[in-house]
Amino acid sequence: NVMKQYENTYRCFEFIGPSPIDYDEHLSYGECVWEELCKFNLQDNIKRGKFKVGIIFNLDKHNKDGSHWVALFINIKKREIYYLDSYGEKIPKQINKFSNKVKKQANALNLPKFILHENKRRHQFSDSECGMYSLYFIIYMLKNDNFGKFTKQRIKDDYMKKLRKMYFNH
């Protein structure tokens, strides 16, 4: 619901997810685990005026309980893709595969090359705020478009706990 509010406020924004890491695995009835990601089409997003895309992934597969949340943010106009893991870990193979899919689609449309930026700074030291870091990252990038905030200084767990109260004040 939090991300839907931002989609309504920012018409150029689309949120996808939260999706498990194995989004492109085909299930027994032929559909992908997460159809929006399997069928993601850069040209369609451009036509619809959706120039900013936020995606939250869980690093567990679809048949598991969920382990750790991470986020991807695509700025189509700037030709940039940003990845945030609050632990500062490298982008997983499956998410990098999606990033490469976006890059290939851009290339097919004769658009300038998209660049992937990864956060290598560890922000999270608690064991429960990864979802909040992912939400905050997408919202911050949507509003401020400044990845340096995540690469240059640590954002503390206590700040995420305050944001949780703000985003989910019920």
Question: What label would you give each PLM region?
Answer:
Residues 1-70, 76-81:
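Cysteine protease catalytic domains with a Cys-His-Asp triad
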